[in-house]
């Protein structure tokens, strides 16, 4: 009753960050899962380090940098880079996502994404999965220039929906 909006993180919450590597299982071989996990871990570490150093780089550049590092660590052929990056732009949603969004829409609750991703990347993700019509807003950290968990990031939906933090249900797979 007090919830005005449900705000989802995108990567790892709505979209399976391992799905790009999963689609390349045959080429990556048995190390695909370790590779996928290392890529994501490196990506998150790079965002935290950049925030601490106050040297912002957009999420796509960090995704590329973390992929390059992980490919080198796992000795993956350079030819796979573009394929993995193209697949990352179209990550698969988790199976329960559409049903969850439909349920929230039926309750007339505002639905939004709050993500480290760039506006362009997030738009591509929701459109490639045909779920763009479920979202009232997509908030990107690019408008504040610092990564989560900085409090300024979470103020965006609070200001937009003119409410208190306790009126927003924020859902994320990252803690």
For the regions a language model picked out, list residue spans one by one.
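Glycine-rich phosphate-binding loop signature in dinucleotide/nucleotide-binding domains
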Residues: 1, 106-109, 161-167
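Active-site neighborhood of HAD-like aspartate-dependent phosphohydrolases
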Residues: 1-44, 73
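An amphipathic alpha-helix signature
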Residues: 21-22, 36, 40, 60-68, ...
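Short helix-capping segments at alpha-helix termini
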Residues: 28-32, 73-79, 106, 130-134, ...
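A metal-dependent, Asp-based hydrolase signature
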Residues: 33, 47-83
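Substrate-recognition element of Asp-dependent hydrolases with the DxDx(T/V) motif
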Residues: 78-92, 97-127, 137-141
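Substrate-recognition "cap/lid" segment bordering the active-site pocket of phosphatases
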Residues: 118-169
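Acidic di-acidic motifs
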Residues: 172-173
């Amino acid at each position: 009753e007090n919830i005005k909006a449900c705000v989802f993180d995108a990567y790892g919450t709505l979209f399976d960050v391992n799905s790009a590597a999963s689609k390349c299982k045959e080429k990556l071989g048995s190390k695909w899962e370790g590779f996928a996990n290392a890529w994501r871990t490196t990506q998150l570490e790079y965002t935290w380090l950049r925030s601490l150093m106050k040297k912002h780089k957009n999420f796509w550049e960090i995704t590329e940098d973390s992929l390059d590092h992980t490919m080198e660590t796992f000795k993956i052929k350079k030819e796979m880079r573009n394929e993995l990056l193209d697949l990352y732009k179209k990550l698969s949603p988790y199976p329960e996502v559409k049903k969850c969004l439909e349920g929230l829409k039926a309750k007339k609750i505002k639905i939004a994404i709050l993500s480290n991703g760039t506006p362009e990347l997030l738009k591509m993700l929701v459109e490639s999965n045909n779920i763009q019509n479920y979202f009232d807003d997509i908030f990107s950290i690019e408008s504040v220039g610092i990564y989560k968990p900085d409090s300024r990031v979470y103020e965006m939906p609070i200001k937009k929906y003119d409410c208190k933090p306790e009126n927003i249900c924020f859902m994320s797979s990252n803690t």
